[in-house]
């Protein structure tokens, strides 16, 4: 296939280019508490819905059916994604982002360790089940995600206050519902900056609540024995990181190809608003970079 179709899609979206934004100035004009003081009657519709329907299971789903009644990415929460270096945390999160896009929940990815084109190509292959990147693959993905997927194009370290402003703008002006930060170490450099790490995560929780979005925070695990999944307390830096987030998900890959264990284990070891904590076994297709549920006895979970 030639580049014609890709060019056609790009031309259609030409008018949707974002304006230049001074994020810091924008943030300063938006952080007012005036609209937080409300009358009790303002909650009538919400109360009426609750009384009629009760507590509903809400939130975006993982792309694995066995978790749909067990875990959700609820708005107003922060999920910590951890795992050993090279165990496919970012790849898994991109795969999940495709699921969010399928239900028209807008996503913004701030990957400070990977250029946007690499992220787009990887997600395009996952979405199209393709073992290679082609014009057709990218065009199909662009048509699917063009209006709902954003990237914050910055590699390297970034000041925390600047990131807060970007998150605020993405949610308020673009309607983003999932903001992905990859990773914490590019915002708070230094494993021993415990107070800064705590303050950063607390502020992310505050923003998630205020903006009614879900924030996904990727973080690295301390070096250790990689033949078993880690837990949230193995995350580098302050224990306040895992203490303050709402959910903790851990991605572990079977690097040694042990036959009795699955290719990948996705482990939930914290869910503040849900009862389930546990693991699910997944197979991994390296050619398409897709993860699939395993229903055999070789679960390892």
Indicate where each model-derived feature is located.
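Core recognition of P-loop NTPase motor domains used across DNA-transaction enzymes
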Residues: 1-75, 143-146, 205-210, 279, ...
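Conserved inter-motif catalytic segment of the P-loop NTP-binding fold
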Residues: 3-12, 16-24, 58, 103-192, ...
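C-terminal regions of RecA-like/P-loop NTPase motor modules
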Residues: 6-11, 23-26, 37-39, 164, ...
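The Walker A/P-loop phosphate-binding site
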Residues: 27-129
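Hydrophobic/aromatic beta-strand patches that form the interior of the parallel beta-sheet core
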Residues: 79-81, 108-110, 150-152, 216, ...
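Cofactor-binding loop segments of dinucleotide-utilizing enzymes, especially the Rossmann-like FAD-
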Residues: 112, 220, 253
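Structural recognition of the conserved hydrophobic beta-strand(s) that form the central parallel beta-sheet
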Residues: 180-181, 213-220
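Charged helix-capping and loop-helix junction motifs
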Residues: 194-203, 231-235
């Amino acid at each position: 296939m030639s580049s014609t179709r890709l060019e056609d899609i790009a031309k259609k979206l030409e008018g949707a280019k974002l304006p230049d934004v001074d994020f810091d100035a924008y943030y300063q004009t938006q952080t007012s508490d005036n609209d937080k003081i409300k009358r009790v009657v303002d909650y009538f519709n919400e109360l009426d819905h609750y009384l009629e329907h009760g507590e509903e299971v809400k939130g975006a789903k993982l792309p694995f059916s066995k978790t749909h009644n067990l875990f959700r990415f609820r708005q107003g929460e922060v999920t910590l994604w951890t795992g050993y270096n090279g165990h496919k945390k970012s790849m898994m999160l991109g795969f999940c982002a495709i699921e969010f896009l399928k239900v028209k929940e807008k996503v913004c990815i701030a990957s400070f360790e990977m250029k946007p084109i690499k992220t787009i190509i990887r997600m395009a292959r996952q979405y199209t089940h393709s073992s290679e990147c082609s014009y057709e693959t990218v065009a199909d993905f662009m048509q699917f995600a063009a209006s709902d997927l954003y990237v914050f194009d910055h590699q390297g370290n970034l000041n925390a206050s600047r990131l807060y402003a970007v998150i605020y703008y993405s949610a308020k002006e673009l309607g983003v519902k999932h903001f992905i930060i990859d990773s914490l170490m590019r915002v708070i450099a230094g494993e021993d900056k415990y107070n800064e790490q705590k303050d950063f995560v607390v502020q992310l929780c505050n923003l998630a609540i205020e903006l009614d979005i879900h924030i996904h925070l990727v973080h690295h695990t301390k070096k250790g024995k990689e033949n078993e999944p880690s837990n949230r307390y193995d995350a580098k830096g302050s224990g306040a990181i895992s203490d303050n987030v709402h959910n903790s998900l851990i991605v572990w890959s079977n690097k040694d190809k042990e036959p009795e264990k699955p290719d990948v284990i996705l482990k939930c070891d914290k869910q503040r608003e849900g009862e389930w904590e546990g693991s699910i076994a997944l197979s991994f297709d390296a050619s398409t970079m897709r993860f699939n549920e395993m229903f055999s006895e070789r679960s390892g979970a």
